[in-house]
Amino acid sequence: MIQVLLVTICLAVFPYQGSSIILESGNVNDYEVVYPRKVTALPKGAVQLKYEDAMQYEFKVNGEPVVLHLEKNKGLFSEDYSETHYSPDGREITTYPPVEDHCYYHGRIQNDADSTASISACNGLKGHFKLQGEMYLIEPLKLSDSEAHAVYKYENVEKEDEASKMCGVTETNWESYEPIKKASQSNIPPEEEAFYQRYIELVVVADHRMYTKYDGDKTEISSIIYEIVNTLTQIFRPLHIRVALIGLEIWSSGELSKVTLSADDTLEAFGEWRKTVLMNRKRHDNAQLLTGMIFNETIEGRTYKSGMCNPKHSVGIVRDYRTRRHFVANRMAHELGHNLGIDHDRDSCTCGANSCIMSATVSNEPSSQFSDCSLNKYLNYIVRYQSTTRCLHNEPSETDIVSPPFCGNYFKEVGEDCDCGPPANCQNPCCDAATCKLTTGSQCAEGLCCDQCKFTKKGTACRPARGDWNDDTCTGQSADCPRNGLYG
């Protein structure tokens, strides 16, 4: 049994009201300095893990006590995760680093239903959390006292510049790619289709400008990408999409595709490189280029609308122009949203925040939420283009999840019948969130052949016909929808 470690942090808080300090996120005003004192409560004889599966931090923000609950993001890496860089003479070097005991967490604030947190615990606490609708950042201070941390509101980070920035996908060009083959009408109601789990196996590429920007420090670049993807996985959870990092590549010896001031040309070249090189080397669903290039026309990212699963068009490019990882994760989520058929938000779209993920202009305070319009667009996309987005159905096998099973992390792992998340978040009547077992009388909790907790009748169509092939049908013995030879 995995022991849950509860860590209580007692903090001495020293506010620096009106003062300014240069932190990793930039120049910050009005921050608080906190000194964590870690109290560990492990059962007698329990083994101390380097990075615990669950942690709890108690501290004060603006004089008020808060309790931060954290759980390790166990779906962050795939089993065959790899990292690739290049020697000075251009020779490819690929490694398979152990990632089981990583230090990246998701979390929430106790008694705040709308709270979120994305934290790295690798060297102190670093990341962001939302409390009472406001975004806070936390990071270790680079002082001789290694226990000192800074906590500050996102709004107190001085902006690099106030020029309006934008996504490169505009109304005049976002139809540049649409899947040619459209699925016939599904027998599955759209409201049910929205709740089926999908998966994006992601490769992130750091270009040579990123490599030189960070002085050739591959470890730092990798950590940056881990933080970005950790936030990315949290952003896509409401869409029932699990994002797993399957590969990371650093162009350490030079650019491997053309990177220019033109975002369009850069995207075109990167898509061609993905199709002809990367896909032959690494199985994945989507690739994102993180670049140090400053594009023309204040463009921060570019992609192909509805390009997901296409060999050349399931790509995006994102500029790494800020040290705030949450901001870059927001832009990458935005481009992935376009890949999934989502348009820019209109003025009438809402998400409960000042700005939403799919806003056409880049907000200085990024959102972590998709709007109501985005959710509807995504649902329309997956219903309309089922046959061309089948890569999203490639669920990792239970043995592909590299960490030990942990009930409540949304991943069905070895020994579990289901996993609908923590009890407070679970909305699946077929699954007991406390045990990750099926509820009494239930045969299944999810799947194309699961209806009201029971296996669908044998012969029921679960995936519509494609071309000359007949419908895929349920067996009556499983919640899975078996694929015919065309898609097997």
UniProtKB/Swiss-Prot annotation:
Domain Disintegrin intervals: 404-488
Residues making up the signal peptide according to the UniProt record: 1-20
Top-level taxon of the source organism: Eukaryota
Carbohydrate-modified residues: N296
An annotated GO cellular component: plasma membrane
Record's keyword terms, sorted: Calcium, Cell adhesion impairing toxin, Disulfide bond, Glycoprotein, Hemostasis impairing toxin, Hydrolase, Metal-binding, Metalloprotease, Platelet aggregation inhibiting toxin, Protease, Secreted, Signal, Toxin, Zinc, Zymogen
TM annotation in the entry: none
UniProt: Zn(2+) binding residues: H334, H338, H344
Binding site for Ca(2+) 2: N409, E413, E416, D419
Note on cofactor: Binds 1 zinc ion per subunit.
InterPro entries, per the entry: Disintegrin_CS (IPR018358), Disintegrin_dom (IPR001762), Disintegrin_dom_sf (IPR036436), MetalloPept_cat_dom_sf (IPR024079), Peptidase_M12B (IPR001590), Peptidase_M12B_N (IPR002870), Reprolysin_adamalysin (IPR034027)
Residue ranges annotated as propeptide in the record: 21-191
GO BP annotation list: proteolysis
Compartments where located: Secreted
UniProt note on tissues of expression: Expressed by the venom gland.
Binding site for Ca(2+) 1: E201, D285, C391, N394
Function: Zinc metalloproteinase-disintegrin VMP-II: inhibits ADP-induced platelet aggregation (probably by binding integrin alpha-IIb/beta-3 (ITGA2B/ITGB3)) and degrades fibrinogen.
Extra facts: The disintegrin domain belongs to the long disintegrin subfamily.
Sequence similarity: Belongs to the venom metalloproteinase (M12B) family. P-II subfamily. P-IIb sub-subfamily.
Protein's name according to its UniProt entry: Zinc metalloproteinase-disintegrin VMP-II
Species per Swiss-Prot/TrEMBL record: Crotalus adamanteus (Eastern diamondback rattlesnake)
